């Protein structure tokens, strides 16, 4: 076991990414780039790379049930969390093609330069799962840093989906993306 590192130049603080004047020119292109990057990540051959032997698989049902059980163990009911949890349990995606999922792909785990995305950081929770999780996670309100733009605070759904579809050659399922956005 081990890891390889190299020095990269860029910004990783989410609030700065959505506000920095130095990134103003690239910001409108970031959602599309993120879609392209996610399509490449999700296309990695799990068997050829051996990732199927070292990463665990989490279905949407596994993920939601585990999270729901942890929440209930606190025994501090929160009506909105209860409602969201029940909604998620009632709308679990099924029959999915699984892929490598970063699982924390968001503004704050991306390094951005004036040229675009330089790196995807923090892979410690990667697993095999529903690839739409990554697209939904970057759209979660928490990662917008006060911006009204839904994708990481810097872009539109349409741009994220277009970037993904351009590389993956498959349509993005907005319903599954919304499922994971609600989960977040």
Positions of predicted regions on the chain:
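ATP-binding pocket architecture of kinase catalytic cores
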Residues: 1-97
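An acidic site on a long C-lobe helix of protein kinase domains
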Residues: 30-34, 80, 104, 109, ...
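All-alpha amphipathic helical-bundle segments outside canonical DNA-binding/catalytic cores
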Residues: 54-55, 171-183
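Conserved protein kinase catalytic core
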Residues: 12, 51, 110, 128-130, ...
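Active-site acidic catalytic loop and adjacent metal/ATP-binding pocket
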Residues: 1, 41, 86-133, 137
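Active-site activation/catalytic loop segments of kinase-like enzymes and analogous catalytic loops
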Residues: 133-169, 183-184
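Contiguous beta-strand/loop segments that form the cofactor/metal-binding neighborhood of enzyme cores
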Residues: 92-95, 170-174
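Aromatic- and histidine-enriched alpha-helix N-cap/loop-to-helix transition segments
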Residues: 58-59, 108, 155, 180-184
């Amino acid at each position: 076991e081990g890891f390889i590192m190299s020095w990269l130049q860029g910004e990783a603080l989410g609030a700065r990414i959505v506000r920095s004047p130095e990134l103003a020119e690239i910001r409108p292109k970031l959602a599309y780039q993120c879609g392209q990057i996610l399509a490449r990540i999700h296309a990695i051959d799990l068997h050829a790379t051996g990732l199927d032997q070292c990463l665990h698989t989490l279905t949407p049902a596994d993920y939601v049930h585990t999270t729901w059980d942890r929440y209930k163990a606190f025994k501090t009911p929160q009506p909105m969390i209860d409602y969201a949890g029940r909604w998620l349990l009632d709308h679990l995606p099924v029959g999915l093609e699984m892929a490598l999922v970063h699982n924390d792909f968001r503004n704050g785990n991306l390094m951005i330069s004036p040229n675009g995305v330089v790196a995807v950081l923090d892979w410690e929770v990667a697993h095999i799962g529903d690839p739409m999780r990554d697209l939904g996670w970057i759209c979660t309100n928490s990662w917008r840093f006060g911006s009204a733009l839904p994708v990481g605070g810097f872009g539109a759904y349409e741009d994220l989906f277009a970037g993904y579809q351009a590389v993956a050659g498959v349509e993005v399922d907005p319903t599954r993306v919304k499922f994971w956005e609600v989960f977040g």
